[in-house]
Amino acid sequence: MEPIDDLTMCLEDPSQLDQLMSELRQRFTIKEGEGQPVDWLLGMRIHQNVEEGYLSMDQELAITKLAKVILDDNEMNSAHYVKHPMLHSSPLPRLAQDSPLRVTNKREFHMLSCCGSLLHIAGSTRPDVAAAVGILCRHAASFGRQHVNAAKRIVQYLYATRNMGLVYKCGDCRPECFSQGRHPKDDGTNRLVTFADSDFAMDETRRSCMGMVISMNGAPISWTSTLGKTVATSTAEAEVNAAVVAAKDSLHLRSMLQELGIDHGPIILHEDNSACIAQGNGGLRLVRNAKHYSTKLRWLQQVIVNGDVIFEYCPTAEQLADTFTKPLDEETFLKFRERMLVDVSHLL
């Protein structure tokens, strides 16, 4: 067997690519056609239009393949009726290993395989299903018929919206290319726009779900929907935990931009919890009611004092990270989805 490695590169000068490919050919066997613009990468379709100044990413093919495996013909035909991936009014129950409601025949439904495919899609081009997929995956080891229906609903939703994807733009891109899929706080430039939120004690374990999303050039570039490792005892603590996660990721991305020669100022962190903002902006001091999470709070205070992060209050109605903390009602979900994704079929 021959080892196969994939390498994706971004270069401004074509002569740099020629030089690099020449050096690689001296050491490795490279197939004909390599070194060309990327059209497909790990199931993602990438379309770049240099003249009009945008790049789109979607996973229509991967979603269609998954739907054909998970859904029957009737479920695929009725997929267009599914407007959002998970019902906010029907939480999924945890099933014990000896529960009679468990699906014991794993061949009846391959939940782990389905969750793996959904995680890849949710983490690559579909941030709108990140919260629903995260909730589903918590039940992958012990699931019942209700969980199977929830998995199929997510796949149906993805299949019905398989043409939606991310669109990134440069400064002079045509307005119609990004009139949707962009939050009002995102001006479409090389500037990181960060949102952080938390749903306090939402799980049966009373742990809080943390959500964050970072946008740049008109679309999300990083997002997270994860259950906290410990139980937060207040809304402020849960929000501080989410803010720390968002700030760490944002500072890492800022350092990458600086290596690319893009000068970036402080990270603007949008938060809708006044207590979290007050604790973070309070300077390097010990908050009496925050002793049990003082380490995370002190780190957050430090990056704010240093000028690396600036808190900005964001009303809950505009808090994009709310999408990543819990299933939302249809109207709110669709509003936030339009601020992240675009129908890319007319761009291809």
Locate predicted features.
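Long, low-complexity, charge-biased intrinsically disordered regions
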Residues: 1-348
